Amino acid sequence: MLKLDHIVISSESLDDGQAFIEDRLGIKAETGGEHRLFGTHNKLISLGTSYLEVISISPDLIAERTPRWFNLDNFTGHPRITNWVCSADFSSFVPHDLMPEIGDILDLSRGSLRWNLTVPKNGILPFEGFAPALIDWGVSKHPSKTLKENGR
């Protein structure tokens, strides 16, 4: 069974993404971290059991793998929702059986977090980015459990 894990807002810079969130929602995003494999960094906002991720290419990192995830190499313009990610238990099904274009399952980590994520070789999710990426957090604590609640 698939379940919404998080929503992705892409931005040309993390500062622009932060300003976008503060202007629209009146909430300051928490620092997430860096993804060295893709040369990106992010900030996060709690949505209860899921979260909002603001992501951009980091000017301080060199990507080890390109094209980058979420089609960030081709992203231009104002920050906006570009993708969504669904959680799944990869031990119970093979993502490629669901949708062959979903991409490779990459074993990723940042600090104490470990996860598996589907990433197409071209960085663009199926159906021109409309299909979700799939994520399996395994035994890692879901990021939403460590974020401040932003209820209003």
Per-region residue spans from a language model:
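Weak global preference for isoleucine
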Residues: I7-I9, I21, I27, I45, ...
